[in-house]
């Protein structure tokens, strides 16, 4: 890269865009640049020099009449050869994240069906896509070559599939590129089907642009022009007036300048000829990056006047020389070349450009080349063995325990200046989710065994049983000085197979094979431990409460119910040590398709399972095996008396780093809380519950804890409540509030007796109103006086603000929105906790005010058994299940029982715009009212064929999407809750080729549908394949 060159950015397409609330606004998708980060498309990505990347410009095609007749004839011929490429990179690999995008290519061999485009389009990993010709004929395309370094790749299609237009090839003429020639860039600019942009080549000798942390080209020069191309133009032909392709559009600046960068066609032309002749495309390299530097810089590096004179005489028009920039440790050039060496000769020939250097290296794989250099003015001659670039370019990866791995690539090694070796984590999920980084980790060792390469890593993982906890050491490419050491939980039960994917350049697919099934878990053994002592407290009973807290870590392998995270942790309170019952927030344990790890006394680690999920009050009860715990765990004593406003209490909490903090404090308020609903993707939230706040700053720092009396009696739980997503920061709001213990006692009592609580619910949400409002709405003075006498702390009644849609609503009277509730079973309702009477009654006698009239009605309640998800389907990368309770709380009508909860990036669902919060009502015109009918309809669809889905958005807008099925990377999978399953409690069924397979299938990456932590990501969008 030139010293004065500004930062360049690739112009790549981003996935379909949706309205700010995450729901599909229209079924017409807009286009822009690919967001290369894992964050939401609205979040700016930061350049490596600290500046924010700007949105791409939307430019107009060349105005009619601006071209001569000669240009018009040329353009008419060229556009027939240009295709729009729509593609998915189906999973993260090397420098490329899983994504869906559009780009451009052009036919370079009509007889064999070869299309030239960019390497960042073809990608280094699994690719799935198709091309659309000028007459809108569509044909599948697959990669047959992607260059290890340079930004070009070649796709293959079946020419016989194009029936309605003649297919011609665009000749490649790299020799015709000249400074000052007028050119046209013909392609899919800014997502348009066809745009024609004009420009003039201004430079032929700029260094390859750097695109930051992702893929970047190097060891080649680039051309520069002012054409103002934009997203989607990647892979466009750069043609001259005679209709020859003289360069390939690759990238450009995104800071407002209309500067574009073109790849010379010398190396693409050589690769094409090799394919046409059936010869291998040899690629040689010495693991050294060279850059072009002008003579004045070379002089400062040691270029002598004598050699400068010889070079200028041999190349009169030359102004640059090649200088060593980056030399990889342990590579062929290590200890032979040094940074700043000026290259003079290769094999005795004077040389100043990349092309002759590459010609020499590509023809010398496995042989030795002799380089002559100037180092600080001294002549140095070295012999270096030329390596095979294909050998240091990964063409396989392994998926195990939720993560994906391959050998470190030359691209990554060059970017970070490290040795080209090691096991690279390309998808840091499941057991290998380190911090918040999705990739970039290098595994150093697992289970005290070093893992220098992928083969060793595979053998080590084969020997680790399911549910084992092993020590792992790793580094990040950005900081190879720091060695991280931690203990991971090896999950081999959600995805039992260790799968190897190997690139097949003949078919364009990646072939999957099973390397090994999981070893059975080792039976746990009892452990002994003691608790810490809580210091500096004058109340021993309060101090003993630390023996009732346990650390709970939850991992969710599949994203359900709109929940934005795939792992959470918090502190749970032991409510029955003999039975191992623990109570914890539902913001930590949102559903029971999960792995729960409970740590007792910071020492004993045991498994947990979900035994109860409260549908409204934001708590879950989990259980561990107490026989495995030899520690003085104490059951917390829960108060049966309601704590009151102004009462003195003791706050014990755990802060964000898991440290215990405590202080004496006062209850400041008790109120009926309304947790805002998330408009983007409905997910669990607390409803119809009283909340407590206290007068201490520690309460806002702690997501778990208790309020406790001096005698050690727990008066309230301190819980995390999941709220809405902030539209500005794209982060999920969390509220820290107290929940009084008397509310919990009926459920806990049943659980202690071994009874699973069967709750009943009123299908509505209430909001507190003041007496001034109640009077206007028709509440009589008599009732207002009763309220003032019954509840002296809060003069309030409750208004129905929202009805929950019930699938099978019982007959009888029902509350309506706007009703004011006065009594239930003859009890005046002035506290939200008094609604708890509904949990144990099939019917309730109620007095309400409706439309200013007082009514006596008999209210039926509904069973809460229907509140949790127990069946899910993964289809074409979309996760579908019945609309969960949060959906029914926010919607007035269910359009079907097939609800899109999430989707995988790089999948057909993402490519064709099947978004979370959509309902699928028909498949190919056939009604699909439930999951069974949907599954019956889609299983019979042949692979790689189109089908129609009729959908309804959350906001009742009908639309139709056409999708193409892909079973190879995204097999149809069914997850069914089954208590008889000993490991997970869920049964997995896979459908491949119309066959039903118990467990995992042969195809697809062997990891569950793992989502990123959605702190800044798109709601409902997850990474990886299933």
UniProtKB/Swiss-Prot annotation:
GO terms for molecular function: serine-type endopeptidase activity. GO terms for cellular component: nucleus. This is Pro-apoptotic serine protease nma111. GO terms for biological process: apoptotic process; positive regulation of apoptotic process; proteolysis. Its EC number is 3.4.21.-. Residues 305-377, 883-955 form the PDZ domain. Belongs to the peptidase S1C family. Residues 1-51 are annotated as: Disordered. InterPro entries: PDZ-like_dom, PDZ_sf, Peptidase_S1_PA, Peptidase_S1C. The active site is at 120 (charge relay system), 151 (charge relay system), 233 (charge relay system). It comes from Neurospora crassa (strain ATCC 24698 / 74-OR23-1A / CBS 708.71 / DSM 1257 / FGSC 987). Nuclear serine protease which mediates apoptosis. Residues 82-272 are annotated as: Serine protease. Its main location: nucleus. It is found in: Nucleus. It holds the Pfam family Trypsin_2. Keywords: Apoptosis, Hydrolase, Nucleus, Protease, Repeat, Serine protease. The lineage of its organism: Eukaryota, Fungi, Dikarya, Ascomycota, Pezizomycotina.
């Amino acid at each position: 890269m030139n010293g004065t060159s500004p930062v360049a950015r690739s112009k790549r397409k981003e996935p379909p865009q949706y309205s700010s609330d995450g729901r599909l606004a229209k079924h017409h998708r807009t286009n822009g640049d690919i967001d290369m980060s894992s964050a939401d498309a609205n979040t700016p990505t930061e350049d490596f020099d600290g500046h924010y990347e700007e949105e791409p410009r939307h430019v107009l095609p060349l105005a009619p009449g601006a071209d001569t007749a000669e240009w018009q004839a040329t353009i008419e011929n060229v556009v027939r050869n240009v295709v729009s490429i729509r593609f998915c990179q189906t999973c993260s690999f090397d420098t490329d994240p899983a994504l869906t995008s559009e780009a451009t290519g052009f036919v370079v061999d009509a007889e064999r069906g070869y299309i030239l485009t960019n390497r960042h389009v073809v990608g280094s990993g699994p690719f799935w896509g198709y091309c659309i010709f000028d007459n809108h004929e569509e044909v599948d395309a697959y990669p047959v070559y992607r260059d290890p370094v340079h930004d070009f790749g070649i796709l293959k299609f079946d020419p016989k599939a194009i029936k309605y237009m003649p297919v011609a090839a665009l000749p490649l003429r790299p020799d015709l590129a000249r400074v000052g020639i007028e050119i046209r860039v013909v392609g899919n600019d800014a997502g348009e089907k066809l745009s024609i942009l004009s420009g003039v080549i201004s430079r032929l000798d700029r260094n390859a642009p750097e695109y930051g942390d992702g893929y970047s080209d190097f060891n080649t020069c680039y051309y520069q022009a002012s054409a103002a191309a934009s997203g989607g133009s990647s892979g466009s032909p750069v043609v001259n007036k005679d209709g020859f392709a003289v360069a390939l559009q690759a990238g450009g600046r995104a800071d407002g300048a209309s500067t574009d960068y073109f790849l010379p066609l010398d190396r693409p032309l050589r690769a094409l000829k090799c394919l046409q002749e059936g010869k291998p495309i040899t690629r040689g390299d010495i693991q050294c990056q060279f850059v072009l530097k002008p003579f004045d810089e070379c002089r400062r590096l040691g270029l002598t006047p004598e050699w400068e004179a010889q070079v200028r005489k041999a190349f009169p028009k030359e102004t640059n020389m090649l200088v060593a920039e980056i030399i990889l440790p342990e590579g062929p050039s290590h200890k032979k070349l040094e940074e700043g060496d000026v290259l003079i000769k290769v094999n005795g020939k004077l040389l100043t450009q990349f092309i002759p250097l590459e010609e020499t290296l590509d023809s010398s794989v496995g042989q030795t080349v002799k380089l002559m250099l100037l180092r600080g003015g001294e002549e140095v001659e070295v012999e270096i063995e030329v390596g095979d670039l294909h050998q240091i370019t990964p063409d396989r990866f392994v998926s195990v325990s939720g993560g994906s791995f391959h050998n470190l690539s030359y691209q990554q090694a060059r970017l970070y200046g490290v040795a080209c070796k090691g096991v690279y984590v390309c998808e840091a999920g499941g057991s290998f989710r380190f911090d918040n980084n999705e990739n970039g980790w290098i595994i150093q060792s697992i289970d005290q065994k070093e893992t220098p390469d992928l083969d060793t890593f595979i053998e080590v993982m084969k020997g680790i049983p399911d549910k084992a906890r092993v020590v792992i050491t790793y580094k990040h490419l950005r900081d190879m000085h720091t060695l991280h050491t931690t203990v991971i939980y090896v999950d081999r039960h959600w995805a039992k197979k260790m799968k190897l994917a190997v690139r097949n350049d003949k078919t364009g697919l990646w072939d999957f094979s099973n390397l090994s099934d999981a070893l059975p878990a080792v039976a746990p053994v009892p452990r002994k431990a003691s608790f810490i002592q809580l210091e500096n407290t004058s109340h021993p009973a309060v101090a003993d409460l630390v023996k009732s807290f346990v650390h709970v870590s939850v991992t969710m392998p599949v994203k359900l119910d709109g929940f934005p995270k795939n792992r959470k942790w918090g502190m749970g309170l032991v409510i029955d040590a003999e039975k191992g019952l623990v109570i914890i927030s539902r913001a930590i344990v949102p559903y029971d398709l999960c792995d729960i790890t409970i740590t007792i006394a910071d020492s004993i680690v045991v498994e947990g399972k979900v035994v109860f999920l409260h549908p409204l009050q934001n708590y879950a009860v989990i259980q561990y095996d107490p026989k495995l715990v030899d520690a003085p765990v104490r059951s917390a004593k829960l108060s049966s008396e309601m704590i009151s406003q102004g009462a003195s209490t003791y706050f014990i909490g755990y802060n964000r780093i898991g440290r215990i903090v405590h202080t004496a404090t006062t209850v400041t308020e008790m109120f009926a809380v309304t947790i805002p609903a998330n408009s983007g993707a409905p997910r669990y939230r607390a409803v119809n519950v009283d909340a407590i706040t206290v007068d201490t700053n520690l309460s806002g720092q702690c997501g778990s804890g208790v309020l406790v009396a001096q005698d050690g009696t727990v008066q309230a739980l301190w819980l995390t409540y999941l709220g809405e997503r902030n539209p500005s920061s794209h982060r999920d709001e969390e509220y820290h509030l107290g929940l009084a213990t008397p509310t919990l006692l009926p459920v806990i009592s049943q659980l202690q007796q071994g009874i699973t609580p069967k709750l009943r619910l009123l299908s509505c949400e209430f909001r507190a109103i003041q007496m001034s409002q109640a009077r206007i709405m028709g509440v009589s003075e008599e009732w207002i006086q009763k309220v003032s006498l019954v509840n002296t702390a809060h003069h309030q009644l409750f208004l129905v603000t929202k009805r929950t849609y019930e699938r099978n609503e019982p007959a009888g009277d029902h509350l309506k929105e706007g009703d004011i509730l006065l009594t239930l079973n003859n009890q005046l309702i002035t506290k939200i906790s008094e609604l708890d009477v509904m949990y144990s009654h099939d019917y309730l006698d109620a007095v309400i005010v409706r439309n200013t009239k007082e009514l006596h009605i008999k209210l039926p309640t509904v069973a809460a058994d229907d509140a949790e998800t127990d069946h899910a389907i993964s289809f074409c990368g979309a996760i579908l299940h019945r609309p969960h309770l949060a959906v029914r709380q926010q919607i007035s009508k269910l359009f079907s029982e097939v609800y899109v909860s999430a989707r995988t990036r790089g999948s057909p669902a993402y490519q064709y715009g099947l978004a979370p919060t959509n309902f699928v009502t028909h498949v190919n015109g056939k009604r699909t009212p439930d999951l069974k009918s949907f599954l019956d309809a889609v299983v019979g669809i042949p692979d790689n064929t189109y089908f129609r889905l009729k959908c309804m958005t959350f906001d009742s807008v009908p639309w139709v999407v056409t999708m193409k099925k892909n079973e190879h990377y995204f097999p149809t999978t069914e997850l069914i809750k089954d208590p008889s399953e000993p490991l997970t409690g869920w049964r997995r069924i896979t459908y491949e080729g119309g066959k039903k397979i118990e467990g995992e299938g042969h195809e697809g990456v062997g990891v569950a549908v793992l989502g990123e932590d959605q702190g800044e990501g798109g709601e409902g969008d997850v990474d990886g394949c299933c």
